[in-house]
Regions:
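Catalytic cores of secreted/periplasmic lytic hydrolases that degrade extracellular macromolecules
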Residues: 1-161
């Protein structure tokens, strides 16, 4: 088994590709976010199946856990309510829909344009990251993971998403 297959198990790759087929969100980006947010699956909130650290809105199924947030120029430990999903595949679908439904956020609209018009995963990451994460190095981390592991190989062919 290759190092990449060990780092990115088949069920996770399939979930990312199913999400891309459902929402259009590039599988490579979802996989890189999964790697960063869950430490390659080591921290997915157990039975909550939430590897992306997606926060819960009022009324959504959730678990409350300690997390780190970057604000005011420093990292802080805080408790927050995170969404709970029936499966990892459901989490990937929700994640893709979240990124591809811009809710009026110009960062997500720009990210979608980069991907849909030019298949530019770097532009997608650079546009999306400041809205998605509080860590100022988030885009750099994602770009590094996609490039180092050749995750762009997992993106669906244009027209299949």
């Amino acid at each position: 088994m290759s190092d990449r297959a060990l780092k990115f198990p088949a069920d996770v790759v399939h979930a990312a590709q199913a999400s891309e087929h459902d929402s259009g969100c590039p599988a490579a980006v979802s996989l890189a976010q999964w790697a960063v947010e869950s430490a390659y699956g080591a921290a997915s909130m157990g039975d909550a199946h939430n590897p992306f650290g997606m926060k819960a809105a009022p009324g959504q199924r959730s678990v409350t856990v300690w997390t780190k947030e970057f604000y005011g120029g420093a990292m802080h430990s805080v408790q927050a309510a995170f969404r709970s999903f029936p499966s990892i595949a459901d989490a990937f679908i929700a994640h893709g829909r979240y990124l591809m439904n811009p809710n009026g956020w110009p960062e997500y609209i720009k990210a979608q344009d980069c991907w849909r018009k030019n298949r530019d995963w770097v532009g997608f990451i650079d546009a999306m990251a400041p809205r998605y994460a509080t860590d100022p190095n988030y885009a750099t981390m994602l770009r590094g993971i996609v490039g180092d592991w050749h995750l762009f190989d997992f993106n669906l062919p244009a027209g299949d998403a």
